[in-house]
């Protein structure tokens, strides 16, 4: 099912959406933070999906517990380290871990730039212990407004040498992309790549805006593109990558069922698309789960799954030499 001769990658993976349940438990007790459960076993339903949520916002409430325990920068570093470990242990050859320093900092008023430093340090420590390639993507969390995103951008750009790209995430309906055009001009000026959550809660116009105004060369989720034939044609022609996260889309009720997921529609239209976990800690999944689902529920053949794997390597924010090195390591 997974072709071991092709690098296995996960490009849409939130670091702050992958905090281990036992880590939440331990950090909560270490810092005297009131948790919603009195045992490790009963904590899981509060931080992981049971079935599916009613909306993206309901899904994000689970995420809130993952950052609620980030009481100091050591906690941030620990979570970053464990993200590298989890990526390696799930069999990934390469992962792009994205994170919102404002979101991670807000509960305990941590310094935003300090959070970025702690993430970088935690990832570096993880890479010493685990055999996996990792790059970082900074997130601007639109839900907190333009001013907060400016603070977030400043903290991230101070460490731009440790980032490959910037992302726009959060409440797509309440905070449309055009509010952040100036932010992403600065991102482009910093020579960072751009991806954006778009076409998930909002329609195809959100994707057009992300591509034409923000400068996105990849789109997170993008499920609503299928209702816009011109956009589908544009995506295919210009090799705009769709970072697809089928289980997450089910969990957030973005799609009603796997059968209704548009992954197949994208593939048939020749759109560059790959498989990703999104928030593996919240969804309680790994990349292998997504490939199993793609085969059993999305009805992809082994040949198509291999193409999806190759697509992921093509879409990755890597140089040609780095891409070749990933393939060479599989021989």
Swiss-Prot record:
<protein>
    <recommendedName>
        <fullName>Adenosine deaminase</fullName>
        <ecNumber>3.5.4.4</ecNumber>
    </recommendedName>
</protein>
<keyword id="KW-0378">Hydrolase</keyword>
<comment type="similarity">
    <text>Belongs to the metallo-dependent hydrolases superfamily. Adenosine and AMP deaminases family. Adenosine deaminase subfamily.</text>
</comment>
<dbReference type="GO" id="GO:0046103">
    <property type="term" value="P:inosine biosynthetic process"/>
</dbReference>
<dbReference type="InterPro" id="IPR032466">
    <property type="entry name" value="Metal_Hydrolase"/>
</dbReference>
<dbReference type="GO" id="GO:0009117">
    <property type="term" value="P:nucleotide metabolic process"/>
</dbReference>
<dbReference type="GO" id="GO:0046936">
    <property type="term" value="F:2'-deoxyadenosine deaminase activity"/>
</dbReference>
<feature type="binding site">
    <location>
        <position position="197"/>
    </location>
    <ligand>
        <name>Zn(2+)</name>
    </ligand>
</feature>
<dbReference type="GO" id="GO:0008270">
    <property type="term" value="F:zinc ion binding"/>
</dbReference>
<keyword id="KW-0862">Zinc</keyword>
<feature type="binding site">
    <location>
        <position position="279"/>
    </location>
    <ligand>
        <name>substrate</name>
    </ligand>
</feature>
<feature type="binding site">
    <location>
        <position position="16"/>
    </location>
    <ligand>
        <name>substrate</name>
    </ligand>
</feature>
<feature type="binding site">
    <location>
        <position position="14"/>
    </location>
    <ligand>
        <name>substrate</name>
    </ligand>
</feature>
<feature type="active site" description="Proton donor">
    <location>
        <position position="200"/>
    </location>
</feature>
<keyword id="KW-0546">Nucleotide metabolism</keyword>
<dbReference type="InterPro" id="IPR028893">
    <property type="entry name" value="A_deaminase"/>
</dbReference>
<dbReference type="GO" id="GO:0043103">
    <property type="term" value="P:hypoxanthine salvage"/>
</dbReference>
<feature type="binding site">
    <location>
        <position position="170"/>
    </location>
    <ligand>
        <name>substrate</name>
    </ligand>
</feature>
<feature type="site" description="Important for catalytic activity">
    <location>
        <position position="221"/>
    </location>
</feature>
<feature type="binding site">
    <location>
        <position position="278"/>
    </location>
    <ligand>
        <name>Zn(2+)</name>
    </ligand>
</feature>
<dbReference type="GO" id="GO:0009168">
    <property type="term" value="P:purine ribonucleoside monophosphate biosynthetic process"/>
</dbReference>
<dbReference type="GO" id="GO:0004000">
    <property type="term" value="F:adenosine deaminase activity"/>
</dbReference>
<dbReference type="InterPro" id="IPR006330">
    <property type="entry name" value="Ado/ade_deaminase"/>
</dbReference>
<keyword id="KW-0479">Metal-binding</keyword>
<comment type="function">
    <text>Catalyzes the hydrolytic deamination of adenosine and 2-deoxyadenosine.</text>
</comment>
<feature type="binding site">
    <location>
        <position position="12"/>
    </location>
    <ligand>
        <name>Zn(2+)</name>
    </ligand>
</feature>
<dbReference type="GO" id="GO:0006154">
    <property type="term" value="P:adenosine catabolic process"/>
</dbReference>
<dbReference type="GO" id="GO:0005829">
    <property type="term" value="C:cytosol"/>
</dbReference>
<feature type="binding site">
    <location>
        <position position="14"/>
    </location>
    <ligand>
        <name>Zn(2+)</name>
    </ligand>
</feature>
<dbReference type="Pfam" id="PF00962">
    <property type="entry name" value="A_deaminase"/>
</dbReference>
<dbReference type="InterPro" id="IPR001365">
    <property type="entry name" value="A_deaminase_dom"/>
</dbReference>
């Amino acid at each position: 099912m997974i072709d071991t001769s092709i690098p296995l990658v996960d490009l849409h993976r939130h670091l702050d959406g992958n905090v281990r349940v036992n880590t939440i438990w331990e950090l909560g007790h270490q810092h005297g933070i009131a948790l919603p459960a009195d045992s490790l076993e009963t904590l899981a339903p509060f931080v992981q999906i049971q079935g599916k949520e009613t909306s993206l916002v309901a899904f994000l409430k689970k995420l809130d517990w993952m950052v609620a325990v980030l009481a100091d920068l050591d906690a941030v570093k620990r979570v970053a380290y464990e993200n590298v470990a989890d990526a390696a242990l799930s069999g990934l050859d390469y992962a792009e871990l994205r994170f919102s320093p404002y979101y991670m900092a807000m509960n305990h008023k941590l310094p935003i730039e300090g959070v970025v430093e702690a993430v970088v340090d935690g990832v570096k420590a993880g890479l010493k212990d685990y055999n996996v390639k990792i790059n970082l993507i900074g997130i601007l969390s639109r839900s907190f407004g333009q001013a907060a995103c400016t603070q977030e951008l400043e903290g991230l750009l101070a460490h731009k040498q440790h980032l490959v790209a910037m992302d726009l995430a959060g409440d797509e309906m309440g905070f449309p992309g055009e509010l952040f055009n100036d932010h992403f001009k600065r991102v482009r000026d910093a020579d960072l790549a751009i991806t954006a959550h778009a076409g998930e809660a909002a329609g195809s116009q959100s994707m057009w805006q992300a591509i034409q105004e923000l400068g996105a060369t990849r789109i997170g989720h993008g499920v609503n593109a299928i209702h816009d034939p011109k956009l589908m044609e544009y995506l295919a022609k210009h090799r705009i990558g769709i970072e697809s996260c089928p289980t997450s889309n089910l969990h957030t009720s973005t799609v009603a069922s796997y059968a209704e997921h548009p992954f197949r529609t994208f593939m048939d239209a020749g759109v560059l698309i790959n498989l990703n976990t999104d928030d593996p800690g919240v969804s309680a999944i790994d990349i292998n789960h997504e490939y199993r689902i793609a085969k059993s529920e999305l009805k992809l053949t082994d040949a198509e799954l291999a193409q999806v794997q190759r697509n992921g390597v093509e879409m990755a924010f890597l140089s040609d030499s780095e891409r070749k090195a990933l393939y060479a390591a599989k021989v």
